[in-house]
Amino acid sequence: MVLTTGLKGAHVLITGGTRGMGEAMVHKFLQEEANVSYCARTVTNTEYDDFYSTLAEGNTARAVGTAFDVASKDSLVKWVESSAERLGRIDVIIANASPMHMEGETEHWESSFAIDVMGFVELVKAATPYLEKSPQASIIVQSSFMGREFYRSPPAAYGPCKAAQLQHVQELSHFLGPKGIRVNAISPGPVLCKGGPWELYSKINPEWVEEQRLKIPLKRLGGPTEVANVAVFLASPLASFVSGTNMLVDGGIHVGTQF
């Protein structure tokens, strides 16, 4: 018996889809024969041309990108509407874009709130009328284990804004569940991505990164594909009774019991 995700032909929207975990998600959904509409601040629409050649024979799934700032509500709504028109429907949305501000200046708080919180809120609002018509509607937000617990870092915008996402997932799962829309969060732990913060930390303070690695029960950093695999699961009919969940993908570094 071959386990299939049931995502062939699904139509997926992903914010922040050109690098890191967002890029890995686009790859995985294309491999599952889902069509993807993605956005980022900078898009060339050739990001995935080389990747198409790696897809299985007969897989015609494609990804189309749009460049805009997720903090712009008007641009976000326009993107959702144009994606729905081009794809024909929307089955899955993934709020992945994040400025990842680990600093605590006012501008960092404002940027984090605009993208991590309001970007998620407005994406859901814009996409819900389309998701209501889908037989497999799924909303996923990329949060963080730092939204769940304190990670011994100075006061900063990132953790509190990620915590707000988790609370909103709970609200949405109850409100949208009767409409057949599942809502879940993914909370990665330390994940090494090209151009990401952990790659930067590895260059400027490798001793500290090694200390953090040893605190992880699996004794290694995660990879972006490992997070993308969870996104595919949560988006698929395999997770048809999973909603209101915060899926930790952190190698076991979290502390305490998740109720």
From Swiss-Prot:
Top-rank lineage group of the source organism: Eukaryota
What subcellular compartments does it reside in?
Cytoplasm, Cytosol
Q: What is its EC number?
A: 1.1.1.-
> According to its UniProt record, which residues of this chain constitute the active site?
S143 (proton donor), S144 (proton donor), Y158 (proton acceptor), K162 (lowers pka of active site tyr)
Q: Which residues bind NADP(+)?
A: D69, N96, K125, Y158, K162, V191
The record's family statement is: Belongs to the short-chain dehydrogenases/reductases (SDR) family.
The protein, known as:
Isoepoxydon dehydrogenase patN
Principal location? cytoplasm
Q: Which GO terms describe its cellular component?
A: cytosol
Q: Which organism is it from?
A: Penicillium expansum
Q: What practical uses are noted?
A: Patulin was originally used as an antibiotic and specifically trialed to be used against the common cold, but it is no longer used for that purpose since it has been shown to induce immunological, neurological and gastrointestinal effects. Genotoxic effects of patulin with dose-dependent increase in DNA strand breaks in brain, liver and kidneys have been detected in mice. However, more recently, it has been proposed that patulin might also have anti-tumor properties.
Question: Which pathway does the record list?
Answer: Mycotoxin biosynthesis; patulin biosynthesis
Q: Which CDD domains match?
A: SDR_c
Function statement: Isoepoxydon dehydrogenase; part of the gene cluster that mediates the biosynthesis of patulin, an acetate-derived tetraketide mycotoxin produced by several fungal species that shows antimicrobial properties against several bacteria. PatN catalyzes the conversion of isoepoxydon into phyllostine. The pathway begins with the synthesis of 6-methylsalicylic acid by the polyketide synthase (PKS) patK via condensation of acetate and malonate units.
For this protein's source organism, the top of the classification is: Eukaryota, Fungi, Dikarya, Ascomycota, Pezizomycotina
Under SUPFAM superfamilies, the record lists:
NAD(P)-binding Rossmann-fold domains (SSF51735)
